[in-house]
Regions:
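Functionally constrained cores in energy, signaling, and assembly domains
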Residues: 10-12, 52, 91
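Catalytic alpha/beta core of large soluble enzyme barrels
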Residues: 48, 57-169
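A glycine-rich phosphate-binding loop feature that marks nucleotide/adenosyl-phosphate handling sites
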Residues: 1-6, 37, 42-52, 98-112
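Internal maturation/activation junctions in enzymes
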Residues: 4-48
Length: 169
């Protein structure tokens, strides 16, 4: 199947996701026939994609960007190739991990949300509306058979005074 990430970068929200899901199903049918396997029962989903979002320069899954500018920190073993490469070629990005300085490092990657991106200053209800939109316009149309569809993977954080409203929503 096809999973989307970077939704809060806001590029896909105005697009016709139902048509895109239809294209995914059609292409899955074509390729499945070509290689002699069954068509996928579920062809579309949304999940957080930490590493993918870093490589692509997007937000993670359906979640908002942390802020307009921020530092993203990743912990890595000092035996990993990425650590060795950055230590030699860009040492300003690498620091010893406080609790395990002997074998673990922290890579600090500056982030900048693109103009027009959704930031985490949005309300929980804005995120819920986005989850609903993507679930109904992307995930559900990509479902072929079976009682379980994929879901949009999301963490919704509610403030104390939002619980009742969220329950009614």
């Amino acid at each position: 199947g096809v999973s989307m990430t970077g939704i809060a970068s806001a590029a896909v929200l105005p697009l016709d996701m139902k048509a895109a899901a239809s294209t995914v199903k059609r292409e899955n049918t074509r390729v499945a026939k070509l290689i002699g396997i069954n068509k996928a029962a579920r062809t579309t989903c949304v999940k957080p994609a930490g590493t993918t979002s870093l490589v692509l320069g997007t937000s993670s899954g359906i979640h908002a960007w942390h802020n307009e500018f921020y530092i993203r920190r990743l912990r890595v073993g000092k035996n990993e190739p990425i650590y060795k490469y950055l230590k030699e070629n860009n040492p300003d990005l690498v620091a010893d991990e406080y609790f395990r300085p002997h074998d673990t490092a922290v890579i600090e990657i500056p982030q900048s949300a693109p103009k027009g991106s959704i930031l985490r200053t949005e309300s929980a209800f804005d995120l819920l509306k986005r989850v609903k939109k993507v679930a109904t316009e992307w995930v559900k149309p990509g479902h072929r058979k079976g009682s379980n569809t994929h879901n949009v993977s999301a963490t919704i954080s509610l403030k104390e005074d939002e619980w009742d409203k969220a329950g009614k929503w």
